[in-house]
Amino acid sequence: MKKVVILLVVFVWSSLLTETNACTGITLRTIENLPVTARTIEWAATPLNAMYVVVPRGYKQQSYLPNGERKGKKFIAQYGYVGIAVEQAEFVMEGINEVGLGAGLFYFPEYGKYAPYEEAKRSQSVSDMQLVAWILSNFATIEEMKEGMQEIQVIGTDPRASTVHWRITEKSGKQVVMEIINQQIVFYDNPLGVLTNSPEFTWHLTNLNNYVNLSAGSVNHRQVGNLSLNAFGGGSGLHGLPGDMTPPSRFIRAAFFQSTAPTLATT
């Protein structure tokens, strides 16, 4: 009966992914340069069954496998953490642990590719939807997490579901994006702290160059021949900022809006 329930949850999750529109993550900085991460999780047509989870040190978990059985890698929380899970408590979408390491997953269709599941690596296999929980349970820094990733195999639980990519932030303020492309794990430093969805993260950084003309505030008066030109109103420096909901456009908006946010002290 349990196997049937798990397979049903995986099916519902894969169905929801086909309707997913948007995940947008930003990172604000305090005056002390401490990171404050935030994000959205938006779904097109289906209410999201989300839940708040509090996981103590010593909590035992085991990864699900593609057949729906919970017989993958076992792990015990070395650090307690809190987070937001979807569909069931093991599937943590975003969270932070007691030593300040934060992690979240973002929809990444068409561009990611995990290695196929191998029964011989069953005890090393962690499902993509449980990777955030595994990271938060085990690591205090990004470097520790990178080393740990060499010891596991990330797997998908359903071939119909999209791949995802991840944002990991440590207390020092360092942040990386992790993607699995052509079965290889790659890490990118994330100086902006922004993440959306497809295509790959480096493409989004390159695309920012298309908007090098944008700036906060208003453009200055300009004389063209005998004609005097003035902006119609405030905010003209952001004329041309894309307004649609595609991942590239959301990345651009998040990057520029974030850059104009005030820097505040912690309290």
Residue ranges and their predicted role:
Residues 1-4:
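Positively charged n-region of N-terminal signal peptides that target proteins for export
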Residues 7, 68-81, 138-151:
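Short, basic/low-complexity N-terminal boundary segments at the transition from targeting/disordered tails
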Residues 7-15:
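Bacterial N-terminal signal peptides
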Residues 21-36, 44-50, 157-162, 170-171, ...:
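C-terminus-biased signal that marks the final domain/tail of proteins
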Residues 22-120, 160:
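A contiguous strand-loop segment
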Residues 94, 99-129, 142, 146-209:
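Acidic/His-rich structured neighborhood in mature extracellular/periplasmic domains
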Residues 121-153, 245-267:
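Alpha/propeptide regions of enzymes that mature by internal proteolysis
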